[in-house]
């Protein structure tokens, strides 16, 4: 059974509901937040009527893995996501098990820190038309899915109406100031390279990913927040499927998007997914977890 929504009573207060996560404050830990990853799934900006069982758990456990890998290299907001370490006020809610992260509150920077290691998706479309990626000059003659000589930092910001808006990297300093902009750009690429190398040894190519950062206002240092290197925030390819000239299928919602498109349901609300699509999508997420962590899915 997929968990589509949460509703925690006092001492919790729900402060935000995203496409996947519910965020809570709690009077017992006022400097922290509770992130709960539900099993909701969206495509083409619409949330499906039914979810993907265990998806929220997979996202949480993959993020947990990457926070552990990256914490020597960057400050993070994660206090714990391990059930046995969470306070009783949380663990008395059994439905939250393995899908909850207790995190420190930080001021969030209004930047989506996207790093691209390979030319695919919207970057490939722009390159075909203009020969650039996010307005950046890149080598001529590149083929689809080819690796860039060096990973590109291609940020976006939230426009007033809530849609992501691509911006040139130079624009970031106008939004957060030059010091934080430099930290975000350099740290994003550094973290991507570390994760890319870890994943490649496990048979996965991270084509691109999105990081989000807060700032520790006592030190003015950036802090890695939100989910990290999951199938929802990244494009994962099987290394065994990879050839330059064609983008492989990814471990994300591409299977779902393909089904919606084939059935003329893309960009339509209130879509219920058939059981075979739900299960095939669930398997994709679980496979990503098992390959990345090297562990059998058991949650």
From Swiss-Prot:
A GO BP annotation: 'de novo' IMP biosynthetic process
Annotated Gene Ontology cellular component terms: cytosol; nucleus
Catalytic activity, reaction form: 5-amino-1-(5-phospho-D-ribosyl)imidazole-4-carboxylate + L-aspartate + ATP = (2S)-2-[5-amino-1-(5-phospho-beta-D-ribosyl)imidazole-4-carboxamido]succinate + ADP + phosphate + 2 H(+)
One Gene Ontology MF term: ATP binding
Matching CDD domains: SAICAR_synt_Sc
EC numbers, comma separated: 6.3.2.6
Keywords noted in UniProt: ATP-binding, Ligase, Nucleotide-binding, Purine biosynthesis
EC main group: ligase
Keyword Signal: no
Keyword Oxidoreductase: no
Entries under InterPro entries matching the protein: SAICAR_synt/ADE2_N (IPR028923), SAICAR_synth (IPR001636), SAICAR_synthetase_CS (IPR018236)
Record pathway: Purine metabolism; IMP biosynthesis via de novo pathway; 5-amino-1-(5-phospho-D-ribosyl)imidazole-4-carboxamide from 5-amino-1-(5-phospho-D-ribosyl)imidazole-4-carboxylate: step 1/2
Superkingdom of source: Eukaryota
Family, per entry: Belongs to the SAICAR synthetase family.
PANTHER family documented for this protein: PHOSPHORIBOSYLAMINOIMIDAZOLE-SUCCINOCARBOXAMIDE SYNTHASE
HAMAP family, per database record: SAICAR_synth
Name of the molecule in the record: Phosphoribosylaminoimidazole-succinocarboxamide synthase
Species whose genome carries this gene: Schizosaccharomyces pombe (strain 972 / ATCC 24843)
Lineage: Eukaryota, Fungi, Dikarya, Ascomycota, Taphrinomycotina
């Amino acid at each position: 059974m997929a968990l589509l929504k949460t509703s925690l009573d006092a001492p919790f207060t729900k402060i935000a509901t995203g496409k996947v996560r519910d965020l809570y404050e709690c009077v017992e830990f006022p400097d922290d937040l509770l992130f709960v990853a539900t099993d909701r799934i969206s495509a083409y900006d619409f949330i499906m009527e039914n979810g993907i069982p265990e998806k929220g758990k997979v996202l949480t456990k993959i993020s947990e893995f990457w926070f552990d890998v990256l914490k020597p290299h960057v400050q993070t907001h994660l206090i714990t996501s391990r059930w046995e370490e969470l306070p009783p006020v949380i663990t008395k809610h059994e439905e939250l098990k393995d899908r909850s992260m207790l995190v420190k509150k930080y001021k969030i920077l209004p930047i989506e820190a996207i790093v691209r290691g390979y030319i695919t998706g919207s970057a490939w479309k722009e390159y075909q038309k203009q020969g650039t990626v996010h307005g950046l000059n890149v080598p001529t003659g590149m083929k689809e899915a080819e690796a860039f000589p060096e990973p590109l930092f291609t940020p976006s910001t939230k426009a007033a109406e809530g849609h992501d808006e691509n911006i040139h990297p130079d624009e970031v300093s106008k939004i957060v100031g030059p010091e934080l902009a430099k930290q975000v750009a350099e740290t994003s690429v550094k973290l991507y390279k570390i994760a890319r190398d870890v994943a490649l040894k496990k048979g996965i190519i991270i084509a691109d990913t999105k990081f989000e950062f807060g700032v520790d206002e006592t030190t003015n240092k950036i802090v890695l927040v939100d989910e990290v290197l999951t199938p929802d925030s990244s494009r994962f390819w099987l290394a065994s499927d990879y050839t330059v000239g064609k983008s492989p299928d990814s471990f994300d919602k591409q299977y779902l998007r393909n089904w919606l498109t084939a059935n003329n349901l893309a960009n339509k609300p209130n879509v219920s997914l058939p059981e075979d699509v739900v299960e095939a999508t669930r398997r994709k997420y679980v496979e990503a977890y098992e390959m990345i962590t090297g562990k059998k899915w058991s949650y």
